[in-house]
């Protein structure tokens, strides 16, 4: 600080000030002007108006905008131009292997800050509008698991009880991993799984328990110390999902077991749907069991949905053959 203050005085013999320190001081003085619009303060005002956001979304937006602020430094938001936006996207795309959706979310979150600032008259335009992202890599098409995939995975030496239980519930119910991980024994009654909420409105549903799962669920209950069907999971991610770390574990196991990239846990839902369709189960039954809101599998029923008994009969028809059913 002393070198910055006195270095311009004739006869000063102290150390020369560091250039970055000088620049930061200049920025700080500039931003202290009452007419300035520091990016940090504008972002704080922005988030005060974002109370409606889900916790996970707000945390993600906060992190992504803070990362941008660290990159660009102390600036007046009005000084940020399209060249800065373009350079930041290039920086992100070249800084390491990043999924296209992750990059898109980062840019979208920052863009939302500038959209808000423009609507408040703080900036004249949004520099992140029409900033092109790198081309998305060709998506790997997921395929349903066949019996060989299922047997290879479930017989893999490093598989543990929770891995088997989650996989079995998935192939005999079509449930999402997050739904399976959030299942409590309090949600199991009248010989059915009762899912109270989920990814979509139609995710709340009742799924009859396949007879093959009965013994497995008894074992799950005897092992559970927290009331969950899949017990002892460590939550993770922005919103502390129980499935967060477990999903990563299952991915590593699939890779080590030698399953192809096209076979992921979520494609067990495709496996369930395909098997049910091949059995001639009506599509509206499959749709309700899976909690679909896909237009191709829209419910042809009243808003109350189908009665439980027709669904129980449909799910009872499902079989993967003796080898899988006996596991």
Where are these regions (language model features)?
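Basic, Lys/Arg- and aromatic-enriched nucleic-acid-binding interface segment
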Residues: 100, 104, 119, 123, ...
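Short, aromatic/basic-rich helix-turn unit that serves as a nucleic-acid recognition element
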Residues: 37-65, 95
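N-terminal helical hairpins
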Residues: 1-37
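Conserved tyrosine-mediated DNA breakage-rejoining catalytic core shared by Y-recombinases
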Residues: 149, 173, 182-218
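Short, polar N-cap/turn motifs at the start of nucleic acid-interacting alpha helices
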Residues: 187-190, 260, 281-301, 323-327
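C-terminal catalytic core of tyrosine-transesterase DNA break-rejoin enzymes
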Residues: 168, 172, 179, 267-293
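Catalytic-site neighborhood detector that most strongly recognizes the C-terminal catalytic loop/helix
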Residues: 144, 197-201, 290-320, 324
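Active-site/catalytic core of tyrosine-dependent DNA strand-transfer enzymes
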Residues: 210-260
């Amino acid at each position: 600080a002393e070198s910055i203050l006195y270095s311009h005085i004739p006869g000063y013999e102290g150390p020369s000030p560091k250039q970055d320190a000088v620049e930061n001081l200049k920025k700080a003085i500039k931003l202290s002007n009452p007419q300035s619009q520091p990016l940090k303060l504008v972002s704080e005002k922005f988030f005060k108006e974002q109370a409606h956001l889900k916790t996970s979304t707000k945390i993600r937006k906060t992190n992504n905008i803070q990362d941008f602020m660290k990159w660009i430094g102390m600036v007046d938001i009005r000084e940020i131009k399209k060249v800065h936006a373009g350079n930041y996207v290039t920086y992100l795309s070249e800084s390491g292997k990043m999924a296209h959706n992750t990059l898109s979310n980062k840019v979208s979150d920052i863009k939302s800050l500038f959209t808000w600032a423009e609507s408040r008259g703080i900036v004249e335009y949004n520099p992140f509008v029409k900033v092109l992202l790198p081309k998305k890599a060709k998506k790997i098409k997921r395929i349903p698991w066949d019996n060989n995939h299922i047997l290879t995975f479930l017989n893999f030496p490093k598989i543990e009880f929770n891995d088997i239980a989650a996989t079995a519930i998935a192939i005999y119910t079509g449930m999402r991993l997050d739904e399976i991980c959030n299942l409590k024994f309090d949600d199991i009654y009248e010989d059915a799984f009762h899912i109270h909420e989920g990814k979509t409105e139609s995710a709340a549903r009742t799924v009859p328990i396949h007879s093959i799962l009965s013994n497995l669920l008894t074992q799950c209950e005897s092992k559970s110390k927290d009331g969950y069907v899949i017990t002892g999971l460590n939550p993770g991610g922005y919103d502390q999902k129980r499935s967060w770390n477990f999903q990563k574990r299952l991915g590593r196991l699939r890779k080590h077991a030698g399953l192809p990239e096209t076979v992921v846990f979520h494609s067990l839902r495709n496996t369930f749907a395909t098997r049910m369709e091949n059995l001639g189960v009506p599509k509206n039954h499959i749709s309700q069991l899976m909690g679909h809101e896909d237009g191709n599998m829209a419910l042809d029923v009243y808003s109350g949905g189908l009665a439980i008994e027709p669904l129980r009969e449909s799910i009872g028809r499902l079989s993967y053959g003796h080898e899988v059913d006996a596991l």
